[in-house]
């Protein structure tokens, strides 16, 4: 099933693109404060609360500090690529957010609550997310530092391990809906129920792979401070370092918006027609969830991430893709997927709860 959507004039598209860029940059600034305050609460501390009322001006202080720090370009660096790398990371991080619908058609002052609406939206998102890694790779290559190069190589190698699972997880909603358009996916969920219920394994794989793609704990291996002295941005300082942080947080925010859009109904809700509020609450929940994981989880080793990507994420995503494809190809009732999805949840829960812990070395109790 396909739906038709109105098209905005070019000036409105440009205005909405500007609003998205300004909004994401503002969100990045305040997410640094929110994350630090939440991490502090998890660790029974106060967090930054000195600059301005309740510490609300801390992002401004951080921005001023970054701008006025000395901007160093090391002698052995490739200057052009060294400067280009953080710009690539930020630009491709910004490009994905414009496709996300935040409400029904015509709900943004008579215009559409998205920047652009592409029939190949999922393919576009996948391509943009893959291109963003070039910024990380070029930063390590151009820095002339072995730590930076190792960080960028880690990012490139781990990308292959989790992106295959992520891509297959995206195909589950595409097969069910029969469209690559994000608005079609949201409208299908409005009529048939959240895709999370039909494809729990795909949801789980996409959630985990999104954390890896945003380089969030426990998958922040490219910048592991204890092992790589900061990783791919070891040699960066001042505003260039801030641009890498900006790209990471924008990926973080975009992932938190895409997960509910693809699997949790987007702006729709069975009760109370307040689409912008529901979308904001779902986005805020996943922002909090990712910060919670960072506060309570440990960083995986490099080999553990590769083993996890190839040994768990990819097989699980492939299995569910084949199951979904079989149900769709044979035109079986979609309730079969509901039962299989619930069964997969119980199996995975049982595996987590009843997996025996490895014996301690040395035979200690």
Curated annotation (Swiss-Prot):
GO terms for MF: NADH dehydrogenase activity; oxidoreductase activity, acting on NAD(P)H, quinone or similar compound as acceptor; quinone binding
EC number, UniProt record: 7.1.1.-
Principal EC category: translocase
UniProt xrefs under PROSITE patterns: COMPLEX1_ND1_1, COMPLEX1_ND1_2
Membrane topology summary: Multi-pass membrane protein
InterPro entries: NADH_UbQ_OxRdtase_su1/FPO, NADH_UbQ_OxRdtase_su1_CS
Primary localization class, coarse: membrane
UniProt KW keywords: Cell inner membrane, Cell membrane, Membrane, NAD, Quinone, Translocase, Transmembrane, Transmembrane helix, Ubiquinone
Pfam families named in the record: NADHdh (PF00146)
Protein name, as recorded: NADH-quinone oxidoreductase subunit H
Gene source species: Thermus thermophilus (strain ATCC BAA-163 / DSM 7039 / HB27)
Species lineage: Bacteria, Thermotogati, Deinococcota, Deinococci, Thermales
Gene that this polypeptide is encoded by: nuoH
